[in-house]
Amino acid sequence: MAEHFKYEEMTDEELIDQLREGDRQVMDYICDKYKNLVRSKAKSMYILGGDSEDLIQEGMIGLFKAVRDYDCGRDASFYTFADLCISRQMYTACLLYTSP
């Protein structure tokens, strides 16, 4: 966690820029920062035949997609965009697991 100290004062947008400039440790920090959001969303959903860990994994995939696709020049904050990407990924997983 000591290595995360240098990221604590940075905005999400600055973190994304840092990651895109090659600082791979930033992704660990972002995952740690957003894990509670992912977990709270996983608690409110259900996958037939799955468990909350499956949804948490799907949520983390959504977070990775948010980091990959976020446009720092847009009006939406990264948090808002990540929240949407995480929710969509989880919702899609629920649909795929329950469809015949």
Language model features: what each stretch is:
Residues 54, 58-61, 80-88:
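Structural recognition of an alpha-helix C-terminal capping motif at a helix-to-coil junction
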Residues 1-56, 60, 67, 71, ...:
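Extreme N-terminal regulatory/targeting segments of RNA polymerase sigma factors
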Residues 97-100:
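Conserved small/polar residues in nucleotide/adenosyl-binding loops
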